[in-house]
Amino acid sequence: LAQARAAAAAGEVPVGAVIVKDGQVIASGRNRPIGSHDPTAHAEIVAMRAAALVLGNYRLDGCELFVTLEPCAMCSGAMLHARLNRVVFGAADPKTGAAGSVLNLFDNANLNHQTKVEGGVQSGACSVVLQDFFRNKRNEQDQQKRALHPLRDDALRTPDAQFAGLPDYPWEPRYVSDLPALDGLRMHYLDEGPADAGRVYLCLH
C-alpha cells in the first residue's frame, strides 16, 4: 500500500507490489509507465526486475509476490515465466484482471509451471487508494473543463452539498459543460454506483 500511495503521489495509477522470499521483503515496485515512458513498467514488473537482480536469476523460485491490484495479462504471464510460488492481490480488476476477473491465466493446467494465486487480501484498503486517485483525477478534469467553458450568468449553480442527502450516494458529482447543445449551461450527472443498487437516480439540471 505504501508503494501504491507513492505511485499516486507521482501521478501514476496507484498500484504497488512487493516480493517476499523466506519471510523477508527482497524487492518492491510501484507503477511507473508514465514517468518512465515504458508501457511494461507496471508495479509487478518493476518488483520482479528488482528481485531478479537481487537473486541473480530471472527465475524467482521460492518467492511470493503481493500486489494491491489484480495483475493484468502481461504481468500474469511474467509471473508464470518467473516461476513465482504464489501471487496475492488485493482489489479485483473487472476490466483487465487476468487472475479471475476477465480471464484466469493461472488456471491453465497445460502451462509448464503453476503459480498459486489468492485474491481479495485487504481489498477494501486497496480499493480506497484507487478510488481516491481516480476521484481526484476526475475532479481536476472537471475543473479544467469548467475553466474552459464558463457558465452563463443565468445558469443554475446548485452546490454539491445539495446531493449529499441522496441514499447510497458516496460518489463525487460529475459535470458536462462543453457540449455545444448546452449553450453555456451545465449538465450534472451520476454514472457510477454499486452493482446491486436497488434504485437509479438521474440528476439533470
PLM ranges: what are they?
Residues 1-7, 80-151:
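Zinc-dependent deaminase
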Residues 15-23:
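Short beta-strand scaffold segments in enzyme catalytic cores
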Residues 26-33:
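Short beta->alpha transition motifs characteristic of CBS
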Residues 35-46:
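A short, polar/charged loop-to-alpha-helix boundary motif
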Residues 58-62, 195-197:
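Short helix-loop-beta connector
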Residues 65-85:
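Local cysteine-cluster metal-coordination motifs and their immediate loop/turn environment
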Residues 143-201:
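Alpha/beta-hydrolase fold catalytic core
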